[in-house]
Amino acid sequence: MRSAVVVALLVMVAMSLQLTAAQEDLKYFEREVVAELAAQILRVAQGPSAFVAGPHKRNSELINSLLGIPKVMNDAGRR
């Protein structure tokens, strides 16, 4: 289903580009917007792995790491 939506969006973008290319007055800003939309469509088509920066941490791991910061700083001050 998602791939069908992506293909439909790509077809619409291609058709709109053909219409605007006929006019030959795409401004720099419009080209930038089209490029950004195409990049977003590709990121969505690649799936959730495109949005992940690194390994997932559980909420408890995040909380423990945040709560452990003062202890680490306190231990560093004793040295």
Swiss-Prot record:
InterPro entries xrefs: Pigment_DH (IPR009396)
Chain segments annotated as coiled-coil in the UniProt record: none
Signal peptide: 1-22
Residue numbers carrying Alanine amide: 76
Compartment(s): Secreted
Tissue: Eyestalk.
GO CC annotations on file: extracellular region; synapse
Gene Ontology terms describing biological process: chemical synaptic transmission; response to light stimulus
Keyword presence, Secreted: yes
Domain of life: Eukaryota
Record function comment: The pigment-dispersing hormone causes the migration of the distal retinal pigment into the proximal end of the pigment chromatophore cells and thus decreases the amount of light entering the retinulas. May also function as a neurotransmitter and/or neuromodulator.
Membership in a protein family: Belongs to the arthropod PDH family.
The protein's name in its UniProt record: Pigment-dispersing hormone type 1
